[in-house]
C-alpha cells in the first residue's frame, strides 16, 4: 500500500555543464546525469522522511530526450511521488534552463534500511 505525501515539495539543482562532463561527441556523458539523479532522489526522500535511512533500490528507465552540450545550464528536479511501507518512489527530471526543453526523465525507488534489511517507514 502506498500513499501520496500531503506536502509535495520539489527539489531543484542548477548545473553548468563544463568540459569535464562531456563525452567524445561533446555532449553530456550520461553517467553524470545518472549520478545527479541518484543524489536528487536521495535528497528528496531524506528530506521528506528525515528519520529514514535510505539507499537506492532501483531506477526506472533513464530517458535522455535531448542532447546537453558544454556551456548549457540545466535544472534537475526531484519530487516524492508516493510513499509505501518501506520505500518511496521519487521522480527525477531535468530541463535545459535556457530553452526549457526536457533533457532527461527517470524515477527511483529509495528503501529504508537497518542492518541491510528493509524496515518500515515512519508515516509523516
Locate predicted features.
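HotDog/MaoC-like acyl-thioester-processing domains
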Residues: 7-9, 64, 69-70, 81-124
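A structural signal for short, hydrophobic beta-strand segments that form beta-sheets
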Residues: 56-57, 80
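Hot-dog-fold acyl-thioester-processing enzymes
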Residues: 2-56, 111-124
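Short alpha-helix capping/helix-loop boundary micro-motifs
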Residues: 59-63
Amino acid at each position: 500500500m502506498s500513499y501520496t505525501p500531503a506536502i509535495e515539495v520539489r527539489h531543484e539543482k542548477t548545473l553548468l555543464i563544463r568540459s569535464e562532463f562531456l563525452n567524445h561527441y561533446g555532449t553530456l556523458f550520461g553517467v553524470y546525469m545518472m549520478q545527479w539523479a541518484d543524489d536528487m532522489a536521495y535528497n528528496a526522500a531524506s528530506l521528506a522522511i528525515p528519520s529514514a535511512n535510505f539507499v537506492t533500490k532501483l531506477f526506472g528507465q533513464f530517458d535522455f530526450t535531448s542532447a546537453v552540450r558544454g556551456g548549457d545550464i540545466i535544472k534537475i528536479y526531484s519530487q516524492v511521488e508516493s510513499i509505501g511501507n518501506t520505500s518511496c518512489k521519487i521522480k527525477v527530471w531535468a530541463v535545459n534552463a535556457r530553452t526549457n526543453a526536457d533533457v532527461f526523465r527517470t524515477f527511483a525507488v529509495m528503501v529504508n534500511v537497518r542492518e541491510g534489511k528493509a524496515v518500515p517507514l515512519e508515516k509523516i
